[in-house]
């Protein structure tokens, strides 16, 4: 029925922005008259079982695991992995992060080097426990800064696993701050470390999408001693910054001695495969305080804290 002004009249007792049960159709409260997919998913579970309805072809596409895992659906799965984490972080109003990369095999002080295959590795890994302590302390410093923004800025993010990753999440938990864990399915059994905030604990199939999420909100990246995974993450970040596919942000390597043993950066510049000025993309730190000061200076956080 139209009103005198030509508009459609609302039926008495109804709200255009709410369903009959009083709940908004969408989280933002906007009206959506289309039936939602979760309702149909529930309805489809109780339909009469017949040869036709029992066929896999009859299963709703978006709840058909076998269909979603088909090779042809890889682009869809890539999009889903990107969207799920992005939507949750947006809903939590996570605006920026501090990324912590580092070895899963580095034990906490006093713990045995579980990954060591011989006495030399055992000694080296247990000596490397100093980086666990520094990572934990660094995460505390980041999280103290994050508190001033109600934990929307400078939120610690790690790979969610053991070693340096655990130390990062643990440091945030020490000061009552949330932290993010971006875990990935690996051939051996792995669970997220117990210090990741449960609502910010994510799991990935695709390394590429996982690395995108590490960098999409990053205000700084720290790289502690680690193995192939840490090197992969480091080179991804430094390449994006060097090629200007990513804004310059502090890229901080912990332990100059370790990294110079592993990679001869100066040799790359001398050989001409990188420019001498590319070396300026790298910062080195020995302690959590040194690393945090690099970030504070870059973003002028000391001035913000001044009375």
Can you annotate each of these PLM segments?
Residues 1-23:
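N-terminal amphipathic/basic-hydrophobic helices that include classical n-h-c signal peptides
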Residues 28-36, 40-182:
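Glycine-rich beta-alpha loop segments
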Residues 90-93, 148-150, 173, 193-195, ...:
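Solvent-exposed alpha-helices and their adjacent loops that cap or buttress functional pockets
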Residues 115-116, 173-174, 236-241, 267-271, ...:
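Short, solvent-exposed amphipathic alpha-helical segments in soluble enzyme
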Residues 152-155, 248-250, 279-282:
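Residue-level recognition of the N-termini of beta-strands and the immediately preceding loop/turn
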Residues 157-224, 228-229, 235:
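Phosphate/pyrophosphate-binding betaalpha-module
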Residues 176-189, 224, 238-262, 277:
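Short, acidic/small-residue loops that bind anionic groups at enzyme active sites
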Residues 253-307:
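C-terminal functional extensions of proteins
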């Amino acid at each position: 029925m139209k009103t005198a002004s030509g508009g459609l009249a609302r039926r008495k007792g109804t709200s255009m922005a709410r369903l009959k049960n009083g709940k908004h159709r969408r989280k933002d409260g906007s009206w959506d008259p289309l039936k939602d997919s979760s309702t149909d998913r529930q309805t489809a579970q109780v339909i009469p079982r017949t040869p036709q309805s029992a066929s896999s072809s009859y299963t709703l596409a978006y709840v058909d695991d076998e269909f979603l895992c088909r090779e042809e659906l890889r682009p869809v799965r890539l999009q889903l992995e990107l969207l799920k984490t992005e939507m949750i972080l947006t809903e939590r109003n996570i605006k920026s992060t501090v990324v912590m990369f580092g070895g899963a095999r580095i034990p906490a002080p006093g713990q045995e080097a579980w990954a060591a295959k011989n006495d030399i590795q055992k000694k080296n890994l247990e000596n490397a426990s100093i980086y666990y302590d520094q990572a934990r302390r660094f995460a505390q410093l980041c999280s103290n800064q994050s508190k001033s923004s109600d934990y929307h800025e400078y939120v610690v993010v790690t790979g969610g696993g053991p070693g340096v990753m655990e130390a990062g999440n643990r440091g945030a938990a020490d000061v009552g701050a949330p932290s993010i864990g971006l875990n990935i399915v690996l051939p051996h059994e792995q669970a997220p470390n117990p210090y990741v905030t449960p609502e910010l604990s994510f799991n990935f199939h695709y390394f590429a999408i996982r690395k995108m999420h590490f960098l999409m909100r990053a205000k700084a990246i720290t790289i502690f001693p680690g193995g192939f995974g840490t090197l992969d993450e480091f080179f991804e970040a430094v390449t994006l910054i060097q090629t200007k596919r990513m804004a310059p942000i502090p890229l901080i390597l912990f332990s100059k001695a370790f990294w110079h043993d592993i990679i001869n950066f100066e040799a790359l510049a001398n050989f001409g495969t990188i420019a001498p000025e590319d070396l300026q993309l790298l910062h080195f730190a020995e302690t959590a305080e040194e690393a945090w000061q690099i970030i504070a200076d870059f973003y002028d956080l000391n001035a913000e804290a001044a009375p």
